[in-house]
Design a protein with these regions (language model features):
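Hydrophobic/aromatic packing residues within the alpha-helices of TPR/SEL1-like helical repeat arrays
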Residues: 43-50, 84, 142, 149, ...
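Conserved structural position within tetratricopeptide repeats
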Residues: 52-55, 86-89, 147-154, 184-188, ...
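Residue-level recognition of tetratricopeptide repeat
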Residues: 60, 94, 159, 193, ...
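Conserved alpha-helical positions within TPR/SEL1-like repeat arrays
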Residues: 65-72, 96-107, 161-171, 183, ...
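Register position in tetratricopeptide repeats
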Residues: 73, 107-111, 138, 172, ...
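Short coil/linker segments at helix-helix boundaries
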Residues: 107-148
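Terminal, low-structured helical/coil segments at or just beyond the last alpha-helical repeat
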Residues: 206, 210-240
Length: 240
């Protein structure tokens, strides 16, 4: 199978995101679902720099945010969550603080649960439903992370990534219909959101709606996620 020929997608842009990045004023700051490519030594150096700034004067929420980010990236999750909470106390109406605290809380759960191997991510598999079923044995809860995203959505209802992140956590918690709704909302806000199409497709396969799931995976492939075509091939082979 080959990706269909489609017009270039219009980039998803929100002025509020740009304004936030400008307010922080950090060249390293970016909105991304990928792993950071900043060297560990650089992260440690930046973290020490933020500590010095915080000790030298009254804490600014912007510096607290920056330190919370570096703490998260060096896997000091508890300290990171605490630092985000301090930033939120100073700026409780900023949705990006809740978004990042949610992400850190989820990463902390993922890290802890990976130690006892009782947790599985949604990923490409011959039977994605089996992956989700494995989560029933997991005792960890994403409730606090979801609560942060509820707050972020309330403060910034046009932010597709908040719905997408919440959908991921709902899916991993086994709330597939609710996850489907959030993926759909994210797609309505950002029609070129390839990852949302992909994950919604997987969710629909898990809910046994193979036709609509296949359509979403095909769309994800058109938008650049070539792995979606591999999932389609696997399901086609299972049906034959």
């Amino acid at each position: 199978m080959r990706p269909d020929s489609v017009p270039a997608a219009k980039p998803y842009h929100l002025q509020r995101v740009d304004d936030f990045k400008k307010r922080i004023g950090n060249e390293y700051l970016t909105l991304s679902c990928r792993e950071s490519n900043i060297a560990p030594d650089t992260l440690v150096m930046l973290d020490k720099q933020y500590v010095q700034e915080l000790n030298a004067s009254n804490p600014a929420w912007t510096v607290l945010f920056e330190r919370a980010v570096t703490q998260s990236l060096i896997k000091q999750y508890t300290n990171s969550v605490s630092t985000y909470s301090s930033a939120i106390e100073l700026n409780p109406s900023n949705p990006f603080l809740y978004l990042n605290r949610s992400t850190t809380r989820a990463e902390m759960i993922d890290f802890i649960s990976s130690i006892d191997n009782s947790y599985q991510r949604i990923t490409i598999d011959s039977d994605p439903a089996n992956r989700l079923n494995n989560n029933s044995k997991r005792t960890y809860s994403y409730d606090e992370a979801v609560a942060d995203l509820n707050k972020a959505v309330k403060l910034f209802p046009d932010f597709a990534y908040a719905y997408y992140n919440r959908a991921n956590l709902l899916a991993l918690s086994g709330s597939l219909p609710e996850a489907f709704e959030d993926y759909t909302k994210a797609i309505s806000l950002n029609p070129a959101f390839a990852e949302a199409y992909y994950n919604r497709g997987i969710i629909q396969l898990c809910m046994k709606d193979t036709r609509k799931g296949g359509l979403d995976l095909s769309k994800a492939g058109e938008l650049g996620i070539t792995e979606a075509y591999e999932v389609l091939k696997r399901y086609a082979s299972l049906d034959n």
